[in-house]
Amino acid sequence: GYSKSIELGSVGDIRSVIRSQQWDLVINCVAIANHEQCESDPSSARLINQELPGMWADQAWQSGSRFVHFSTDAVFDGSSADRYFEDDATGAPSVYGQTKRAGEEGVLSADPDAFVFRTNFFGWSHDSARGILDFFANGLESGASMTGFRDYVVSSLYVGHLFELMIEAL
C-alpha cells in the first residue's frame, strides 16, 4: 500500500500525494471525531473537519480521481422525532457537527460528483483503545463500571458493512 506523512493543511503536500500516482479513487476518512476535543480546540476542528476535505476533493477532481468523503449524522440538530434524510435541514449545535457539515459543503463545491457518506459507524480501532467497541470490550474485561445514555438514539453501521455499501455505491 501507499503511505506518506504530510503536513496537514498543506495544499502542496496534498497535491503531491494525489499526483504521485493515477488514483482511481481517493477516500477521505480523516476527522477529529471526538466532540469534546472539537469544542475545546475549534481551530483544529475547522482545519481537519472543515477545510481539508475540500482541499482533498479539489485535488482529486483536478487529477480525474473519484472522491469519497465520510461525514456524520451529527450535522443534524437531533430535534426530529423521525429519522433524517439527505435533504433534511441540518443545524448541528456542536462544533463537531458544524465543521463536518462545512466540510461536506467544501467537498461538493470542489467536486459536485463526489460521494458524501453521512453516517455513524463503529468498529475496532487500530490500537484497541479508541473505538466504542474497544470501550465496552475493555470495560467488560476489566470489570469497570460503565455508563451510557438513555436519551440518545442512533443507527450505527459496522464499518465492514459500510465499506461494502461504499463499493456497491461506486
Language-model features and meaning:
Residues 26-30, 67-73, 117-119:
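SDR active-site strand-loop-helix element
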Residues 17-21, 59, 106, 165, ...:
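CheY-like receiver
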Residues 3, 46, 161:
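Catalytic phosphate/metal-binding cores of nucleic-acid and nucleotide-processing enzymes, i.e., regions
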Residues 105-154, 159-168:
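NAD(P)-dependent short-chain dehydrogenase/reductase
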Residues 40, 47, 51-52, 75-117, ...:
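Catalytic helix-loop patch of NAD(P)-dependent Rossmann-fold dehydrogenases
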Residues 8-50:
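NAD(P)H-binding glycine-rich loop region in Rossmannoid oxidoreductase-like domains
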Residues 1-7:
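A short beta-strand-loop structural module common to alpha/beta enzyme folds
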Residues 62-66:
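A short helix->loop->beta-strand "cap" motif at the edges of active sites that frequently abuts
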